């Protein structure tokens, strides 16, 4: 009560922030007449003036009024568009490391030009982050004329671009790209083998469009760069044949209950578990198929990989549905983003799940992958010095933005008051009744010329509604992951009178639905349109626009509630832009996923008590409240999952930063010999300690073991036993010094052969390769640790603390292994004079030619002649990277002398 009273008197935090910023808006508005008087050249010259002021030590925030006034004036001259006062407010919010909640149609793209220009003045680079390539390209091309008018450069960062083009894009003042591409470039830069291969600069300022989609919906998705692991595709096929024999366990109170099934499904946690009966059956089937031996248990340690295959296959069949979770296109399983409904080309599920789905669908099974580098979006975006974002719906997630990213949310008021009518939900008993009611609503709306946008949560549902509309003879457009090529064009015309558009989730975000359709799209479709044609198109559009407003504006129909209120609000937000008329309504049934999992028992009981007849809908505050509670439950659960993921990833993140920092330092120096010398001392001390314990009696020394270890691991053949026999005065300390001195002497002789410069280059290469190899293995080990750590809870131990403790021990062990591997590799490398290598290669070539001639003489048929010709050709060439090294070491050329090339 007291808080409410204080808020009424002093205003909320949001009100106070906006009040403070409105004073700056008044200053910007006062500067407008002065800016209008400037010539184009004088306006352009302001950029150089601002940069000079920053160099002299002026604070960036002091430039806000004048810089924003310059951008507003430039926009008027270049685009003929003037930033509204609310857009200036939005620009200031974005500069203050906050999330700006701006409703759909309020001009977020134009708002972003203000903080982007201001922060680009520092010369450190601005990254504008969008959800897909189309929006990145569109926004970059749309805003390029404005930024170039003001003397700034603009780059676009797209997947598949060559490294020089990416480097150029990142070197620009303002770079547009997708969240995935920025993250992958960061990982690739930290796998580079020379400073020239890196493309990104230091991460300075990120301006994230649709920030809720990227920082919340995708927060659980780690970005992973992977390499191929061993092939086990045959096992996926064999296990896949067994799964259809298993029966799902139904709830005892359900109509389909037939006694105990073989596996149970937990839809909340997306897990599948075998029952006792299921375990017996699956073991029988595995024995029958010859996959497992008679009398063996599926849970025995020897069958742990088989258990992994069975679990993956069960999940693929029970939890993942075609045209909902994925689509099959051109013989490939492509994941569908659960939040946007878009396909995610190139993304794959982990833990063998993707291979299990491929086996289920009968398409080619691709190899499992091993992680080489990974990072979550949560940790990638926290690397920026300054982070801000904008979206139409952030307020429901304000707590998460604040607790995880330290970003406050500021709700920016609309330019014109919102007049959209949000009608109460209608709940039906069955899905068929709900679909029928939706069709009737669409018929009524289109009859009076009102456009309708139907939002579905999956491709399957969008096609179901589409089929029903086709049966009813209603023309419509379908917008889902299968047909997203024309996405922007379809969305742009979704406001046409009586147009019906079915969109999966939030497909088409970022494109405004203009009432009456888009006249710009009509003009763009014409070749060299005349002024008269353009005027006629505009006049026709105005008539259509007025007709749609008269009919009630755009009507939104939600075919079911999403598990997040925010995504429902995004769908509603497509209507009522810029103060336009509009309406929205959600249609639900007791068969919807959200209702079935989270709200079914209570609500269906309520509906039965009310004595509902088939086809009747319930519209009651209790039901709406029950649904809102169900959504809150899911949101809270998802937040906990994301928070927990972050807590675990933070452990890996500290290690990642340490490794990447060390790696970058290594890349930037040309001489690592001092580091190598220091490491050598540590490694030899630890190795000798294992056989000659410090300050121990000679009887405790294991000299034969030490000699063997030095020979095997460091290629040092030292007569230590002989030394000790001949020199009784040789004590522990001098022996240690002599072994180390011998290893240094042998190494220096190698250096004299190849030269210091070549040796420094080789040392750096070995350190980088060894670091990458061990980091890759460490990531896999961390992954295994993470998967089983929750079991420590049964031993009354905190899994998070145990994970921190064990991962730290593993990391320390990895760093010790790094030192050992580097010194071992450098010690064992064989070097020869270039003349010796050439002589050996000449001998090899002559031998190959001799064999080829013998082959030609002994076989005269075409095939063997072709083979001999090929052998002769092979003999002519230089040593291949994977051929045995001519020095006779038995190693591959690339791992021996090829390393010194």
Curated annotation (Swiss-Prot):
GO terms for cellular component: cell envelope Sec protein transport complex; cytosol; plasma membrane. SUPFAM superfamilies: Helical scaffold and wing domains of SecA, P-loop containing nucleoside triphosphate hydrolases, Pre-protein crosslinking domain of SecA. GO terms for biological process: intracellular protein transmembrane transport; protein import; protein targeting; protein transport by the Sec complex. The keyword Methyltransferase does not apply. It catalyses: ATP + H2O + cellular proteinSide 1 = ADP + phosphate + cellular proteinSide 2. SMART domains: SecA_DEAD (SM00957), SecA_PP_bind (SM00958). Residues 859-891 are annotated as: Disordered. Its cofactor is Zn(2+). May bind 1 zinc ion per subunit. Part of the Sec protein translocase complex. Interacts with the SecYEG preprotein conducting channel. Has a central role in coupling the hydrolysis of ATP to the transfer of proteins into and across the cell membrane, serving both as a receptor for the preprotein-SecB complex and as an ATP-driven molecular motor driving the stepwise translocation of polypeptide chains across the membrane. Monomer and homodimer. Part of the essential Sec protein translocation apparatus which comprises SecA, SecYEG and auxiliary proteins SecDF-YajC and YidC. This is Protein translocase subunit SecA.
């Amino acid at each position: 009560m007291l808080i409410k009273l204080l808020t009424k008197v002093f205003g909320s935090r949001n009100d106070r922030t906006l009040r403070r910023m409105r004073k700056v808006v008044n200053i910007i508005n006062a500067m407008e007449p002065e800016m209008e008087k400037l010539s184009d050249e004088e306006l352009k010259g302001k950029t150089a003036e601002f940069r000079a002021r920053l160099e002299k030590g002026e604070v960036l925030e002091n430039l806000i009024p004048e810089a924003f006034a310059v951008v507003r004036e430039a926009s008027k001259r270049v685009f003929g568009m003037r930033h509204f006062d609310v857009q200036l407010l939005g620009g200031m919010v974005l500069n203050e490391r906050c999330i700006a909640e701006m409703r759909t149609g309020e001009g977020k793209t134009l708002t972003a030009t203000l903080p982007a220009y201001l922060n680009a003045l520092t010369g450190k680079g601005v990254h504008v982050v969008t959800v897909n390539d189309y929006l990145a390209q569109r926004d970059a091309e749309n805003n390029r004329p404005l930024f170039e008018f003001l003397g700034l450069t603009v780059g676009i960062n797209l997947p598949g671009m060559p490294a020089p083009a990416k480097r150029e894009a990142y070197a620009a003042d303002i770079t547009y790209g997708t969240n995935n591409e920025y993250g992958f470039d960061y990982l690739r830069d930290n796998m580079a083998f020379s400073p020239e291969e890196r493309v990104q600069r230091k991460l300075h300022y990120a301006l994230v469009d649709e920030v809720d989609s990227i920082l919340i919906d995708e927060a659980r998705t780690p970005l992973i760069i992977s390499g191929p692991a061993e092939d086990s595709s045959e096992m996926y096929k064999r296990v896949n044949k067994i799964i259809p024999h298993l029966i799902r366990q139904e709830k005892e109170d359900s109509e389909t209950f037939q006694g105990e099934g073989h596996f149970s499904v937990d839809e909340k946690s997306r897990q599948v578990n075998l029952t006792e009966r299921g375990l017996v059956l699956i073991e029988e089937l595995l024995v029958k198929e010859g996959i497992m031996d008679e009398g063996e248990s599926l849970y025995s340690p020897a069958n742990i990989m088989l258990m992994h295959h069975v679990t993956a296959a069960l999940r693929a069949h029970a939890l993942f549905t075609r045209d909902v979770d994925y689509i099959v296109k051109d013989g490939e399983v492509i994941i569908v983003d659960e939040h946007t409904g878009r396909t995610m080309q190139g993304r794959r599920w982990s833990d063998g799940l993707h291979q299990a789905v491929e086996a289920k669908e009968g398409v080619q099974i691709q190899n499992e992958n091993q992680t080489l580098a990974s990072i979550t979006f949560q940790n990638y975006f926290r690397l920026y010095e300054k982070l801000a974002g904008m979206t139409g719906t952030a307020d429901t997630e304000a707590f998460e933005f604040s607790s995880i990213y330290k970003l406050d949310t500021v709700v920016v008021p609309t330019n014109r008051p919102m007049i959209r009518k949000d009608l109460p939900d209608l709940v039906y008993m069955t899905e068929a009744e709900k679909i029928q009611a939706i069709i009737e609503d669409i018929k009524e709306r289109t009859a009076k010329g009102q456009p309708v946008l139907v939002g579905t949560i999956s491709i399957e549902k969008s096609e179901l509604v589409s089929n029903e509309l086709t049966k009813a003879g209603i023309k419509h457009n379908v917008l889902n992951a299968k047909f997203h090529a024309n996405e922007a064009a379809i969305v742009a015309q979704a406001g046409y009178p009586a147009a019906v558009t079915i969109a999966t989730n939030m497909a088409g975000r970022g494109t405004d639905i203009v009432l009456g359709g888009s006249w710009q799209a009509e003009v763009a479709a014409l070749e060299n349109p005349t002024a008269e044609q353009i005027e006629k198109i505009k006049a026709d559009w105005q008539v259509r626009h007025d007709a749609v407003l008269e009919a009630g504006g755009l009507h939104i129909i939600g075919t079911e509630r999403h598990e997040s209120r925010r995504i429902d609000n995004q769908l509603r937000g497509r209507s009522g832009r810029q103060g336009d008329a509009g309406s929205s309504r959600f249609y639900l049934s007791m068969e919807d996923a959200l209702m079935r999992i989270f709200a079914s028992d209570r609500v269906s009981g309520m509906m039965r008590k009310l004595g509902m007849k088939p086809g009747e809908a319930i519209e009651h505050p209790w039901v709406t409240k029950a649904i809102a509670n169900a959504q809150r439950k899911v949101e809270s659960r998802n937040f906990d999952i994301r928070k927990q993921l972050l807590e675990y990833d933070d452990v890996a993140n500290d290690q990642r930063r340490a490794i990447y920092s060390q790696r970058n330092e290594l890349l930037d120096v040309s001489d690592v010999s001092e580091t190598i010398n220091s490491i050598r001392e540590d490694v030899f001390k630890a190795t000798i300690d294992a056989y000659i314990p410090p300050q121990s009696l000679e009887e405790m020394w294991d000299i034969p073991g030490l000699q063997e270890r030095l020979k095997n691991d460091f290629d040092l053949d030292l007569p230590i036993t002989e030394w000790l026999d001949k020199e009784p005065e040789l004590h522990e300390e001098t022996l240690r010094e002599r072994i180390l001195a011998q290893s240094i002497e042998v190494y220096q002789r190698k250096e004299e052969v190849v030269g210091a410069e070549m040796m420094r280059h080789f040392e750096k290469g070995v350190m980088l390769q060894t670091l990458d190899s061990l980091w890759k293995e460490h990531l896999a080990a961390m992954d295994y640790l993470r998967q089983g750590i929750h079991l420590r809870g049964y031993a009354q131990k905190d899994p998070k603390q145990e994970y921190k403790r064990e991962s730290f021990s593993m990391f320390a062990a990895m760093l010790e292994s790094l030192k050992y591997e580097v010194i071992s590799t450098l010690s064992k490398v064989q070097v020869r004079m270039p003349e010796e290598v050439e002589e050996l290669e000449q001998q090899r070539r002559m031998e190959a030619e001799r064999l080829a001639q013998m082959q030609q003489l002994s076989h005269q048929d075409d095939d063997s002649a072709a083979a001999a010709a090929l052998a002769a050709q092979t003999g002519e060439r230089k040593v291949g990277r994977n051929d045995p090294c001519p020095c006779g070491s038995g190693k591959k050329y690339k791992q021996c002398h090829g390393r010194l090339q």
